[in-house]
């Protein structure tokens, strides 16, 4: 399984640590989405920014439709 992560809110006004996590996930702004591996490290990053992103599990063959 992989995780599809979509940014639903802007990171303007967020602390620097949160902005770095969003950048580390590969998200560029509201509406952008990426497919990442379902590993403990990515899960931890997503957990820290759950208020800014939407997450869903997808099959292994999925790719990102927007970057």
Swiss-Prot record:
Gene3D superfamilies: Ribosomal protein L30, ferredoxin-like fold domain (3.30.1390.20). SUPFAM superfamilies: Ribosomal protein L30p/L7e. The keyword Heme does not apply. GO terms for biological process: translation. It comes from the Bacteria. This is Large ribosomal subunit protein uL30. NCBIfam families: rpmD_bact. CDD domains: Ribosomal_L30. GO terms for cellular component: large ribosomal subunit. Keywords: Ribonucleoprotein, Ribosomal protein. Belongs to the universal ribosomal protein uL30 family. Part of the 50S ribosomal subunit. The keyword Transcription does not apply. HAMAP family: Ribosomal_uL30_B (MF_01371_B). GO terms for molecular function: structural constituent of ribosome.
